[in-house]
Amino acid sequence: MALRALLVALVALALAGAALAAGSKSTLRITYWPHGRSQSATTWTLGCGPAAGTHPARIRTCAQLKAHPADLRPATRACTIMPTRTSPQAAIQGTWAGRPVNRSYRIGCPGWSDLRLVLTGRS
């Protein structure tokens, strides 16, 4: 009887762990406008755990985001740089560690330098 209770508890823990892992899935869509939003954009997908998608540096990008997950949180400082029509811009939408992400970035604004590899595909 005790063995059966232990087995039931282990199965319940395994199912809870699988549900938690599924809930923390990380899938992002990154759109990059190298010459401003008036020009054409490049869009990549990025999945982490394992690294997947079309992002050109997906393995390094996943490693960076796992090491610094706070980089995807909303900026704590406002951007004081006026955008120009041709300023590089980027946007990230999707889910990171089970939480929704919907952010926009402009060159020189909070978040851009920390996420350069993620946003532009280049370090």
Predicted region positions:
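N- and C-terminal low-complexity/disordered segments
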Residues: 2-123
